[in-house]
């Protein structure tokens, strides 16, 4: 959203409660190696959100008219060009951090500003219209337009919004699970009992039909 606004000539201000991606990497390494948790800069909070430390798989919504534009933004920021046409686009495990940084630099080059370690701790409204935001409990920034992209883990922000009487509506969510099966189980279910007598390729689990008798 900030990049789109910047491209139109506006100068968006972005307040990120966590650190920039490089500082965030150091904080994450400290946690993984020694258990030192920075509550505002970790695998959830910080530049790029949780996706910064994902495996790089893109969940595309083919019927979304904006998807092509989003893919193009990724490519311009350093993602592989093949994600334009792959059925299951993947930008690589280490690429998200590079892409996030490049998008930020593009926003700044277009006139936007990015502030890190800057949590919105309060919102001032009058007559159901936002007038200002408070950063880190101290700095007041006037605005009449505000986008909140806080993910699902900023519970303190949701509590603040609720206390301010701002209407919110929950959205549907999905919970993923990891299922592991022996390779023999998969091959037998897909190719039959003589699976070891034929040449076979790896099966994409999305297209794997579980044969219930084999579960017993």
Model-flagged regions — what are they?
Residues 2-216:
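Residues forming the flavin
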């Amino acid at each position: 959203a900030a990049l789109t606004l910047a491209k139109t000539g506006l100068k968006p201000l972005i307040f990120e409660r966590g650190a920039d991606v490089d500082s965030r990497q150091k904080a994450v390494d400290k946690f993984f190696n020694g258990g030192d948790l920075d509550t505002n800069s970790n695998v959830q909070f910080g530049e790029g959100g949780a996706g910064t430390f994902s495996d790089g798989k893109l969940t595309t919504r083919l019927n979304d008219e904006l998807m092509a534009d989003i893919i193009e933004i990724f490519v311009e920021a350093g993602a592989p060009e093949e994600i334009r046409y792959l059925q299951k686009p993947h930008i690589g495990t280490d690429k998200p951090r590079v892409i996030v940084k490049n998008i930020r630099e593009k926003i700044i080059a277009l006139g936007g500003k990015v502030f890190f370690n800057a949590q919105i701790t309060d919102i001032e409204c009058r007559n159901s219209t936002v007038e200002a935001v408070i950063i880190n409990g101290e700095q007041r920034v006037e605005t009449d337009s505000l986008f909140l992209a806080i993910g699902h883990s900023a519970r303190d922000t949701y509590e603040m919004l609720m206390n301010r009487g701002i209407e919110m509506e929950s959205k549907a969510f999905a919970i993923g699970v990891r299922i592991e099966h022996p390779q023999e189980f998969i091959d037998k279910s897909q190719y039959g009992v003589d699976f070891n007598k034929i040449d076979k390729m790896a099966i994409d689990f999305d297209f794997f039909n579980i044969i219930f008798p084999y579960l017993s």
